[in-house]
Amino acid sequence: MKYKNLMARALYDNVPECAEELAFRKGDILTVIEQNTGGLEGWWLCSLHGRQGIVPGNRVKLLIGPMQETASSHEQPASGLMQQTFGQQKLYQVPNPQAAPRDTIYQVPPSYQNQGIYQVPTGHGTQEQEVYQVPPSVQRSIGGTSGPHVGKKVITPVRTGHGYVYEYPSRYQKDVYDIPPSHTTQGVYDIPPSSAKGPVFSVPVGEIKPQGVYDIPPTKGVYAIPPSACRDEAGLREKDYDFPPPMRQAGRPDLRPEGVYDIPPTCTKPAGKDLHVKYNCDIPGAAEPVARRHQSLSPNHPPPQLGQSVGSQNDAYDVPRGVQFLEPPAETSEKANPQERDGVYDVPLHNPPDAKGSRDLVDGINRLSFSSTGSTRSNMSTSSTSSKESSLSASPAQDKRLFLDPDTAIERLQRLQQALEMGVSSLMALVTTDWRCYGYMERHINEIRTAVDKVELFLKEYLHFVKGAVANAACLPELILHNKMKRELQRVEDSHQILSQTSHDLNECSWSLNILAINKPQNKCDDLDRFVMVAKTVPDDAKQLTTTINTNAEALFRPGPGSLHLKNGPESIMNSTEYPHGGSQGQLLHPGDHKAQAHNKALPPGLSKEQAPDCSSSDGSERSWMDDYDYVHLQGKEEFERQQKELLEKENIMKQNKMQLEHHQLSQFQLLEQEITKPVENDISKWKPSQSLPTTNSGVSAQDRQLLCFYYDQCETHFISLLNAIDALFSCVSSAQPPRIFVAHSKFVILSAHKLVFIGDTLTRQVTAQDIRNKVMNSSNQLCEQLKTIVMATKMAALHYPSTTALQEMVHQVTDLSRNAQLFKRSLLEMATF
């Protein structure tokens, strides 16, 4: 399966960590060449400003959906396309099994390598035009006048004298497709190697069929994925992603490799009371208090064997040992020691109020563990009667704070805003001119009700997240941002209050058709009209508030203490919690809620007596939980300073180059403006011929000859200005300048060429010879049509930037304009001298 080139927008800035990774800024538009390239899950091969490299897929967002294409007979291997074009190697296409061939026998052309592997039936012709199928773009680039369009880079012609010609690269085999070489020695992709000197398909000679039937290559051929790729797939993932190793107790062998998912292993099958104990302890987020759940534990519950389940369960869960566990009730205190509570999943114990250091440490761990838990469950858990830290909670503003890194917060906010806009759009799609009539309401009453409920739900989720961001702003030293966000939030809250009230009133009347259907126009608005009018204003207010939060995300959002910032963190956090209707809420953390608020996975069993940490010692807790996160690479100070120095030096070099480029562009702009402002002279009385033109015995009158010579000189001057403008435009395209730059240069090209059109129109009105008038008019009209084409091509190149196809089309049209302008100038000279 392959994908066509897609466009993707960068959601965040990306600083490359290796030579193959691509650097980009937030908002850049990248061309996605391949997803999950080279078997690297989550890494995409992209192109930006003429450079290619791999980028993390969770840092970009596709602008359009993926379009799959199957390997048809019209598709050719990328590495062999230009070789086939220039006759250096002949590759054969496998017919598409979905293409309904004329008969059941595949027709294969003879091999030009004379290997004799494929035997072709003698009765079938092998005409070359039937064998090779060259894409239309390549045919035009070779035989047409538009010039080559090779690879994914924009090719600009080179100016030679008063014209432009395309220069073909010297070696197409290496420079056609700008794709990094494969790191594997075997063919993983469904593309024959371009440098193969032998037969295309590696089929053993012993399997040749003399019947002339196409022999499908075995699984060991080029098209098969080598076993090493499948075998090393897990190894590749572990090298590319920083997955934590499973936690194992010292001295315990790795009895069985448990799965990656957070599901307790099924090696032990409890029955009876054991099963009851398991379900009472394994279900996180149960509504009953913790003390009540402990009462259901059987005091005679035997602990699992040390070598059977505990070791495997410890392998399945990677949770710090520093997290303390709840003690059982007083009646089961004889079983409260850690060694007899192995296998019982429990909720972490509160830290005593006087142990401040240990409490802060466990709070940090809890924030890390709870960062993906739903906020609805968090709000419900605030009434837990077993929490002793509720009296120690901070101010209300701090209770609602969002402890997220900026990238995760921005992505989550964008999803909420998009869901809100989609909900309002679906409601507006149902509102028509006669949508309140009885017939329409009878058909669409359920759809309207669903759309109203979705708008209210999405707005509620959006407000839930935004309030947390406003709470973060309240903790900043400067309150200017907080006051601004509070004003913008107030508008959205007012709208939400109106929508909630009107929705409640609509539910009170049970959405009765007799009440909602209106056959006559009336001046009074009912609840449904009021809901629609207010819902229209919500996306604009939400967009303004979202823009404010995105702009100040670095100041508003910071990870909480103890949280980890991984490169693929945003994707993993966003996918950890799902909400109805596609919404996702931000996690609001309450310092006193971490007891009743359970994990999405069961907690590990208590540690054995030899390995159980001292719950009364905060120092031991600090030491133990740090050991469990030793897989996190902490960058040293020297390495960090060295990288920062390199980045600063690179940034300074880029700034200097940018300043030099901007200075050159500014001077070029000024020169072009001076040339453009020069008008076309119409006063022939002040004109003196620059050179003596040869006279002939043709029927051209002296007055027409003088006019042709006069405007030929004018055309020569403005033609040079046109070439200078084209040079500036091609320079912008070659340096990958944005649309605002090359569009401005294209205007100079159009204005310069328009002066030539003006000269042609003036000559058409002033010359007396009919044949000369017709020739000048035809040439002038051709230039005018070419200008219209350039305007459209420039517009498409700007709209589809950075599409190389659109840019290349603009370059082709401008090149054609230079040729037509040169022909127009030459025709004036010919008509004046012959």
From Swiss-Prot:
Pfam families xref list: CAS_C (PF12026), Serine_rich (PF08824), SH3_9 (PF14604)
Residue segments, region Interacts strongly with spindle-regulatory protein D1M1: 102-229
Ubl conjugation listed as a keyword: yes
Name the UniProt key words of this record, in alphabetical order.
Cell adhesion, Cell cycle, Cell division, Cell junction, Cell membrane, Cell projection, Cytoplasm, Cytoskeleton, Golgi apparatus, Growth regulation, Membrane, Mitosis, Nucleus, Phosphoprotein, SH3 domain, Ubl conjugation
Query: Under the GO molecular function aspect, what terms does this record hold?
Result: protein tyrosine kinase binding
Modified positions (Phosphoserine) in chain numbering:
S296, S369, S780
Q: Which residues fall in a compositionally biased region of kind Low complexity? A: 369-395
For this chain the motif Caspase cleavage related site maps to: 360-363
**Domain SH3 residue range list:** 3-65
Tell me which tissues or organs this protein is expressed in.
Expressed in B-cells (at protein level). Expressed in the respiratory epithelium of the main bronchi to the bronchioles in the lungs (at protein level). High levels detected in kidney, lung, and placenta. Expressed in lymphocytes.
Q: Where is this region: Required for interaction with ITCH?
A: 1-505
Question: Compositional bias (Polar residues) at which positions?
Answer: 306-315
Ranges for the region named Disordered are 238-260, 291-316, 328-398, 560-623
Using the UniProt record, give the first listed, main subcellular location.
cytoplasm
PTM (free text): Cell cycle-regulated processing produces four isoforms: p115, p105, p65, and p55. Isoform p115 arises from p105 phosphorylation and appears later in the cell cycle. Isoform p55 arises from p105 as a result of cleavage at a caspase cleavage-related site and it appears specifically at mitosis. The p65 isoform is poorly detected. Polyubiquitinated by ITCH/AIP4, leading to proteasomal degradation.
Q: Which residues carry this modification: Phosphotyrosine?
A: Y92, Y164, Y166, Y177, Y189, Y214, Y223, Y279, Y317
- Effect ascribed to mutating M796D: No effect on interaction with BCAR3
Keyword hit for Cytoplasm: yes
Q: How does it assemble?
A: Homodimer. Forms heterodimers with BCAR1/p130cas. Forms complexes with PTK2B/RAFTK, adapter protein CRKL and LYN kinase. Part of a complex composed of NEDD9, AURKA and CTTN; within the complex NEDD9 acts as a scaffold protein and is required for complex formation. Part of a ternary complex composed of SMAD3, ITCH/AIP4 and NEDD9/HEF1; within the complex NEDD9/HEF1 interacts (via N-terminus) with ITCH/AIP4 (via WW domains); the complex mediates ubiquitination and proteasomal degradation of NEDD9/HEF1.
Q: What is this protein called?
A: Enhancer of filamentation 1
Q: Source species, please?
A: Homo sapiens (Human)
Source organism lineage? Eukaryota, Metazoa, Chordata, Craniata, Vertebrata
